[in-house]
């Protein structure tokens, strides 16, 4: 299924039914009073988060959603039936934006979350409400109110604990295959990953978390070059970023960057940080660990020496790991450390909730 993470839809709530002008007509009661009933309320439009959906692709085919109109009131004080609500299912992680005001009106983060996006109109009053001491036979009723109508932009932000950053072809998809049951496409050319992939990492029987691989970033991404920037929103909810670097990328005898992804390891780090700073600086404030991949492409001592030299040159103070995603060597300690971090984050969050009461 094609991955779609943006959609624009129109939602139209039902109008309220009109109130009725009617008079009681019974045998031997020639001058019965008003008995016109009220109109039914119009149906509303709701969004509901559904864990069984993972893309907004359905909204490419259906973009207008209408709730039912309320039924008009009738004689004998009969109220009109309310219009049926329109329920629209969306994936968990959907952000709802009012296009007219550019205001975020909802964030669907849990299965079953409901959001009212267009309220149905109230039913009109029948003429029985307008009877008075000076007007015993009112011939007036109130029409139903108009239902709300909005144009909404839906943005899907995947709910993942770990997000992977890196230039194309550094091995992010291979890493996800190594640590989870996900099977993203892997090949030796850039942009193999065209859409985000999610993998579930199981540490123990009841301990697991989700890792997301998004298309690789390239230099100039903040200006719209490449694929990765349009998917950066999926990393905004993550608790940890893994910044993957191809440690095997080296220069030839003339200093030209030839091998690997086309950038020396230190350039892979610095250029990506520049792109993040330009597009979404908040991502740089998240915990970010360096994962030096493709250590299997050189002798172990050489890989270790290159890694230590890189860390020293970067003055890197956060955790870092030397791994081979292909052979899975060194990948599992990262996952265990990540689980420890998440448990600590939960404990801190729980303490903050208690202290704020």
From Swiss-Prot:
One of its GO terms (cellular component) is cytoplasm. Residues 160-343 form the OBG-type G domain. PROSITE patterns: G_OBG, GTP1_OBG, OBG. The keyword tRNA-binding does not apply. Pfam families: GTP1_OBG, MMR_HSR1. SUPFAM superfamilies: Obg GTP-binding protein N-terminal domain, P-loop containing nucleoside triphosphate hydrolases. Keywords: Cytoplasm, GTP-binding, Hydrolase, Magnesium, Metal-binding, Nucleotide-binding. It is found in: Cytoplasm. Monomer. This is GTPase Obg. It comes from Xylella fastidiosa (strain Temecula1 / ATCC 700964). The gene is obg.
